[in-house]
């Protein structure tokens, strides 16, 4: 990290007059920002100045900007230019030799990169203790420090920053560089508001942990990186999404977890939790970043086109073109956090396109919405609203609109206090009806004050009869779904003052005759009509027609209103006005309500009742309730018992006497006994009172129980006598156990298999009273009765079970489980079945809630004990109970994480694991699922390990390998072992010691579906410690990995495992890889075939570990100088991804460096022209690497020409003593290259490669050794001139790097990649011992 962790100082401090004096540090502190001066003393101590490095003579180190595990970052001043830079010091002690050389090579390449959104690498200087990387200085620190000091970022600012980050990231990806460590601390800012990516490429290598463990902090890491599948450009996109969450929330995802649990969650979860308050655009952006499959993750180029990023750039383009300045960014962050902390709902700025005042106005608008208006008169606006939601007009004959068809005011219909019982306040009196029937259409003024209401629709101009006003719209019989559409014309007509009389209204056609059930509602109102006799005649004739068809004045129902009016083409428009007026003359039903019960002289005929054939009753729908009585009456009449014959002497009870049996004396006695019994039981029940003496209550309860046992039919007597409540009242206060026992038996007998009585008992509060007797303080007999009651509650109906649980029944069930199985087996089994029934309940309550309640009582501990006892028994019942216990365990493993943590007790797990082998196969698989689900939570892994889960599961896997259910068992076991061993070396070694390796190898060879579960465990074994690798050696693990190279899905993982193993035990692994005594394909052939047949994604991913492996082991690299490999590499040299082209060039370079012909291989295998084309590649790093290969080829050709003309070459006259060679760190003169290269300490150019005829013992002595300190097996006969303490370095690295980097310690001059001026002195090369070797 190059940033200042907690300061915002402006500009570099003025240089001290005397370099190296403490005054400079004090002055820099005085010139720092107030934010820094307010820091406590402890922080200022941390930011101490660096110890002067003699090799950094052109720089003066200042205060510390940040510290990490491998070093610190200091601000420094360049004495020559006055430029302020950042110097990252890395301790060499913490770096492996191979990593140091890689870093120095990479820095020399990365310093060529230049983009406004990445931090510039300026070079490096190597000292005896540290490697000093010189970087561009960003004065305003990182986004992490801004968030730490000022709070969370608003979305628009995050979008603006992410736009710049994506531009920098896109540039790096186009250059073939993977950042690997994107987070807020590695995104630095400048005063101009620019953000720059830091710590990409090389610097990220220095933040990792040793022993091939997971690199860096886990919270930003992609799942494929955690699983050691290799980092790609898609891994940076995942980290970018985590950085967005970090800036929005102030913390990265899973920040509340420890690193290892966080790694576990990243791999297992579908995606990290998204911020709750994020906008949909941000959530969509994050979901694009968090695609689990790296192949489906979008690229940086596509993310730049995301709407959120585009809008952020567009909003920024409104202001001047330059980026957001630092002060403005800080101000916006402060305002945003103040808004988050403020109690009111208003916002400081207008969010997107929402109304800025909307949030503030909503609380004020809310009360007015529910405030009732003081004036009940409908306003013009309210009339439109109410009309829109009016009920559809009734279309029966009993139509109120027909009664008001002339001049009634619609506003009167809206009055809530008018009731039909009082004729609507007099509006429907006979006087009013006379006025409605008059021709002038005027309305008499009401005495009740109804004339105060204005009626804008009472007098509407129109073309039709002036007597008509508002009419109901005639509906077609289409059903209820068209009701709203049928009422629209009427409403529209009222709004536009257009009469609706043009709509044809057909005559009424009732569905059924009702003349038998009502008085004739047609009366003569001729005295009400003034002068028009013709109209009266027409009205009367119309009523006559209607009466002939029958009319219906039944109470209208909503389901019939729409179908009353039926359109008929037989009636034209001319008949409609008269029909309207005729209908309106009728009296409303409310006016004759009382008269319908009066007899009608014409209704003396009872033929309809007697069921005469000539009269057909059309039973109305509303009379369905009288079906039984009507049918019974007709059946009686059909028997002619009293009406069919007029003879008065006939006995009306003749039929009754015929049906009587003979007098049965025994039946009479039984009835008498039952009557006496009923009286006795009712007397006993009435005596059950809490005020009775306990002795009396005891006698009563015993008598009642005796009677009930002798005659179970007395159950109904007790219920009818309301005996349940007295029994519950006595049970609530009684303490005599004999009374309690008797009453409990009575209750259980009454409620047995009768869910209605059970529900009634629950409703009156019987459950908590009886549950009390399940406690252990009561004797066994009482507890058994209480248990029988509990059993009835949970197995009869869902409702009783729900009420049982709500009354605290779960605690009762747990208490049953805790009893001794030997003594109280029935109680224990009732508890097991009860808990199973609770989980089997299909109700609205989530099972997770039951799990949480039961986990507080540690229910799985007694359940595991019960499981052990049940497995000792045989029979169907034992198997059922075993299955139910296994299902209960499985349900607990599906609950929330808190429940899993509570149930993952060591004693429970140990007991369950021990009983696994004894369980039946089906239930065994269920219990294995329970263990697997627990293993998916990182906090339970220690408990599983302490319960010997790995040992037990491995043994179970071995014992079931030949059984029919092996596939299901191994599926669960392998998942569990994988979850436990992943990212944990101790558990990996534990599994290896228990013999998991040969089992997994056998599964991989035989079981294809299980191969996907076994291979991850096997490949992770190479990353474990010495114990795991020893088991791999014992089971030919290296040969197994080589065989995996032929699998396109696992070749990348296998090659990464081989490379990791080679790092840990270099000499031994290298020897086996070079040995071709294996019967199968050699390692080199496997790699060549892998590169030849691999698909696009696999080919890209395999290049990274392959180039690392070849760079680490030159002897292995030398075996790859094959024409078939170079042909394949040449086909891919023009790949569209820069990272692929760069890795291919690195592989070719490693092979050339390790071979005798070196750069000559390019011309030999026809790659020279293709690499010459790459010298013009758009990617800077590719161009630079191609140029170095071309120069290597030129040097090789030049050397071969010199070798053909030995007379032209002068032999060396002096040699370098071995002691001097072992201690030097740099040549005495800056220039170290021979063929007119730029004279620099280290500029990444290829040093001269010296051909060697073979890998001699002295060459092997220079190769890197293992991390465990073992040397190569071929180094026994080394010459004494090499020195025993000399570090083993690879020959390829020795050829590629200058002599500056060959030795670990330097005392004379530092190695550096910084450019220096050419020396004006004559260039002379110091002769070396190697020169004398090959020159002679």
Swiss-Prot record:
The active site is at 181 (proton acceptor). One of its GO terms (cellular component) is cytoplasm. Keywords: ATP-binding, Cell cycle, Cell division, Coiled coil, Kinase, Magnesium, Metal-binding, Nucleotide-binding, Serine/threonine-protein kinase, Transferase. Pfam families: Pkinase. Its EC number is 2.7.11.1. The keyword Metal-binding applies. Its cofactor is Mg(2+). Residues 1213-1236 have a biased composition (Polar residues). Residues 654-682 form a coiled coil. GO terms for biological process: cell division. ATP binds at residues 65-73, 88. Residues 1-10, 1253-1264, 1272-1285 have a biased composition (Low complexity). Disulfide bonds: none annotated. The keyword Transport does not apply. Residues 1315-1327 have a biased composition (Basic residues). Required for early events during cytokinesis including localization of cytoskeletal components to the cytokinetic ring. Belongs to the protein kinase superfamily. Ser/Thr protein kinase family. CDC7 subfamily. This is Cytokinesis protein sepH. It comes from Aspergillus niger (strain ATCC MYA-4892 / CBS 513.88 / FGSC A1513). The lineage of its organism: Eukaryota, Fungi, Dikarya, Ascomycota, Pezizomycotina.
